[in-house]
Amino acid sequence: MKYLMYLCLKELKINKLTMKRQMIITLALALTMTMPTFAKKAMTKKEIAEKEKAFKNLQHPWKGKKVAYFGDSITDPNIKASKVKYWGFLEEWLGITPYVYGVSGRQWNDIPRQADKLKKEHGDNFDAILIFMGTNDYNNGVPIGDWYTETFDSVRVARHKPSEMVLRRHRHFAMDKNTLKGRINIAMSKLKQMYPTKQIVVMTPVHRAYFASSDKNIQPDEMYENARGLFFDEYVKAIKEVGNVWAVPVIDLNSLSGLFPIYDAGAQMFNKMDTDRLHPNDAGHARMAKTVMQQLSALPCNF
């Protein structure tokens, strides 16, 4: 019995020593990790003042720039659904000079015309282009199409041996004016060659719901397929792909803006609850503008 008590006391003593040793090691590691903090010299008042000044001098990279806006009715200054458009808020908040070319009802095939008008009126004297287009391509049942066509062509290659001619698949941009992707290719090809050094930003169309301006212009909400049997999100998806196909930033307003007129609760951001859930009102445009402003803060306006 005494022997058993002796063994228990001995084991307890060993456990206490082990715990003590672990605590010492842990404390030593903690001190080692915090030593650089203790050793770091505190900033002087002058250094603090300089950092505060630098922080105050930070400004939005698009502040005071000249920006061209291509688009449809949501960009068109003549549409009365809102007194101030998203580009008007950006002008107010960032001092951006807007060159607006959006026209109601236009589709992606109108971008080349808008680009020509910009060139004629301002030449190269601007900083960037924002494109906000696509909702009318959906409404008019434009086929989605393909980004590329393919051929089999001979090309010379050399890889660790003398060069030789081989037959390989060869992609070409599909320039079909009757499809969405073809129209985008035509537009972006023109812009990339016309303005190779300019920042070009594409924005996805926002969600859309019921619109009726007359007996001859009634547009169901996006939960219905269009005349082509395609849903709205298929057009949005294609426009999002432009970023990788043409090396341009894409601002996904369809998701980021939060505008959702499908439900009555979201219709307050649009022109008329009963007849126009297609065009955002002032509140809707302000929300879009805030989203665009934040997204643009991460992008250079000039190169």
What are these regions (language model features)?
Residues 2-3, 15-22:
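Positively charged n-region of N-terminal signal peptides that target proteins for export
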Residues 4-9:
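Short hydrophobic targeting helices and cationic amphipathic motifs
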Residues 26, 62-63, 270-272:
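Short hydrophobic "helix-edge" motifs at membrane interfaces and signal-peptide entry regions
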Residues 26-34:
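Bacterial N-terminal signal peptides
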Residues 35-39:
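Sec/Tat signal peptide C-region and signal peptidase I cleavage site
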Residues 93, 115-303:
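Alpha-helical cap/lid subdomain in secreted, periplasmic
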